[in-house]
């Protein structure tokens, strides 16, 4: 019985020593993050789509903050994101490329459930977990969560996933208030 208590005491002492060493090492060798990279990453849409040429939003933010990468490469963020980045970094806004010049039409993935074999490759490819389903059962896309990054289309072995535009409703309609004519009527006061 005393051998068990000795083993428990030795393991407890070792865990305290190693825990202390790890705690010291984490403080001593801590890598300080660049605050500008954190701010850039907060502005980006976090769709992790890779359309900018980087594997996600964090590497792109690191490239913009530390390597002087152009701020107009985020296609999902569009002009709004580019203008916010320009204001943050105190640089001139850069014109978007020809393909990003117009506001991109929002598309979401759509799965033809009749042809879905339930292989789960699309679920594994989705960076935001917008696809639900089970193995060997049909899958479906949660359109409110889907960012339209198009990463789920290529892995599908049956080609049952396609990108479809989001239907325009009153909830997602973008009103162009600058084209609505406004006429100011002056009211005369009679005193």
Swiss-Prot record:
Q: Which Pfam families match?
A: Fer4_21, FeS
The main place the protein resides is membrane
Domain of life, per UniProt, equals Bacteria
Ranges for domain 4Fe-4S come to 32-91
Write out the residues that bind [4Fe-4S] cluster 1: 49, 52, 57, 74
Q: Which UniProt keywords apply?
A: 4Fe-4S, Cell inner membrane, Cell membrane, Electron transport, Iron, Iron-sulfur, Membrane, Metal-binding, Repeat, Translocase, Transport
Enzyme class, first EC level, given as a word: translocase
Q: Which Gene3D superfamilies match?
A: 3.30.70.20, Electron transport complex subunit B, putative Fe-S cluster (1.10.15.40)
* Assigned EC number: 7.-.-.-
Localization (cell)? Cell inner membrane
Q: Name one GO cellular component term.
A: plasma membrane
A GO term (biological process) for this protein? Answer: electron transport chain
Q: Which residues form the 4Fe-4S ferredoxin-type domain?
A: 107-136, 137-166
User: A single Gene Ontology molecular function, please?
Assistant: electron transfer activity
Q: Which cofactor does it need?
A: [4Fe-4S] cluster
Q: Where is this region: Hydrophobic?
A: 1-26
UniProt cofactor note: Binds 3 [4Fe-4S] clusters.
Which residues make up the binding site for [4Fe-4S] cluster 2? 116, 119, 122, 156
Indicate which residues the UniProt annotation says bind [4Fe-4S] cluster 3: 126, 146, 149, 152
Q: Quaternary structure per UniProt? A: The complex is composed of six subunits: RnfA, RnfB, RnfC, RnfD, RnfE and RnfG.
Q: What NCBIfam families does the entry give?
A: PRK05113.1 (NF003475), rnfB (TIGR01944)
- Tell me, in a sentence or two, what this protein's role is: Part of a membrane-bound complex that couples electron transfer with translocation of ions across the membrane.
Family indicated by similarity: Belongs to the 4Fe4S bacterial-type ferredoxin family. RnfB subfamily.
* Protein name as it appears in the record: Ion-translocating oxidoreductase complex subunit B
Organism this protein belongs to: Erwinia tasmaniensis (strain DSM 17950 / CFBP 7177 / CIP 109463 / NCPPB 4357 / Et1/99)
């Amino acid at each position: 019985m005393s051998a068990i208590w000795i083993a428990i005491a030795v393991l407890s002492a070792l865990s305290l020593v190693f825990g202390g060493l790890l705690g010291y090492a984490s403080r001593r060798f801590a890598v300080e993050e660049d605050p500008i990279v954190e701010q850039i990453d907060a502005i980006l849409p976090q769709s992790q789509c890779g359309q900018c040429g980087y594997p996600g939003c964090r590497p792109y933010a690191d490239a913009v903050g530390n390597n002087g990468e152009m701020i107009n490469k985020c296609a999902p963020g569009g002009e709004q994101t580019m203008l916010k980045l320009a204001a943050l970094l105190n640089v001139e806004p850069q014109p978007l490329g020809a393909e990003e010049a117009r506001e991109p039409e929002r598309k979401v993935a759509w799965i033809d459930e009749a042809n879905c074999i339930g292989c789960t490759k699309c679920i594994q490819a989705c960076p935001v977990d917008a696809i639900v389903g089970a193995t060997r059962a049909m899958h479906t896309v949660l359109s409110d969560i889907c960012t339209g990054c198009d990463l789920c289309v290529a892995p599908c072995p049956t080609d049952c996933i396609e990108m479809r535009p989001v239907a325009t409703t009153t909830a997602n309609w973008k009103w162009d208030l600058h084209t609505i004519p406004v006429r100011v009527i002056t009211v005369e006061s009679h005193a």
